[in-house]
Amino acid sequence: MILTVTLNPAIDVSYPLDELKCDTVNRVVDVTKTPGGKGLNVSRVLNDFGETVKATGCIGGESGDFIINHLPDSILSRFYKISGDTRTCIAILHEGNQTEILEKGPLLSVDEIDGFTHHFKYLLNDVDVVTLSGSLPAGMPDDYYQKLIGIANLNGKKTVLDCSGNALEAVLKGDSKPTVIKPNLEELSQLLGKEMTKDFDALKEVLQDKLFDGIEWIIVSLGADGVFAKHKDTFYNVDIPKIKIVSAVGSGDSTVAGIASGLANDEDDRALLTKANVLGMLNAQEKTTGHVNMANYDKLYQSIKIKEV
């Protein structure tokens, strides 16, 4: 079983407009509301793929109830209730662009943070892999993911971390390391304080930096150009085919789902990387975020090319 952690979930609201007009009224006909947050996207893709998945995080108010009520029944909801209201994130789709308005979310008390920590420990009993995705809610210290990873490690669980900024830096500088991190080039550049490109020699050099010591897998997303990955002392370039992209939103989360599934099933390097990239591409071919059409899985699987570099 795979446990997904979304500490700062949201209701994602989508407003499609032919044109966004500023300083006036914009009327929307087709409004879409879905449970949002990176970890919930991971949950839905794992569910589509047929994995047994348990979802947790901090939710509150009517928005929190909406999330529980609108997840597929086959996803085991094990959320922790807090006093604050779960946030709303708005995406305005206009003229081929996407403008986002993101609420910060609720402020958690010390007691609520401690309560979730105990809740997390309890949930580990029957899981093999834990995914930790997205931003931390207000009130949680930057090193909170580090704390959860330490607990998971003590219980022999594999962890996949997908976050950025101070939370990621705190994990890299801490003692407890995740099994996998999945930065993109922009996040990698931010971590290292220099601009990174798709130069494989440069990537090989920086991924051997002491900053990444103790992390078994580093999987760097190159967007439409695939992935550059390091597993222990082996480096891989994953080349993906060109596809028609409907929406790339959530494709990184779908890739995390594939990584987690690969770990849970003890797959070899090539199988794990192939599965992860296929799920990312399948999501990009869908209008709905965090959804994959498995009818196209086998064809895309055969089109992935992986080589050691």
Curated annotation (Swiss-Prot):
Pathway the protein takes part in: Carbohydrate metabolism; D-tagatose 6-phosphate degradation; D-glyceraldehyde 3-phosphate and glycerone phosphate from D-tagatose 6-phosphate: step 1/2
A GO term from the CC aspect: cytosol
Gene3D superfamilies in UniProt: 3.40.1190.20
Species classification: Bacteria, Bacillati, Bacillota, Bacilli, Lactobacillales
Name assigned to this protein: Tagatose-6-phosphate kinase
GO biological-process terms attached to the record: D-tagatose 6-phosphate catabolic process; lactose catabolic process via tagatose-6-phosphate
Keyword Transferase part of the UniProt annotation: yes
UniProt keyword Cell division present: no
Reaction catalyzed: D-tagatofuranose 6-phosphate + ATP = D-tagatofuranose 1,6-bisphosphate + ADP + H(+)
One Pfam family, short name: PfkB
Family label: Belongs to the carbohydrate kinase PfkB family. LacC subfamily.
Organism encoding this protein: Streptococcus pyogenes serotype M49 (strain NZ131)
Transmembrane segments annotated in the record for this chain: none
Record GO terms (molecular function): ATP binding; phosphofructokinase activity; tagatose-6-phosphate kinase activity
Domain of life: Bacteria
E.C. numbers: 2.7.1.144
Class of enzymatic activity (EC top level): transferase
Keyword annotations of the record: ATP-binding, Kinase, Lactose metabolism, Nucleotide-binding, Transferase
InterPro entries: Carboh/pur_kinase_PfkB_CS (IPR002173), LacC (IPR005926), PfkB_dom (IPR011611), Ribokinase-like (IPR029056), Tagatose/fructose_Pkinase (IPR017583)
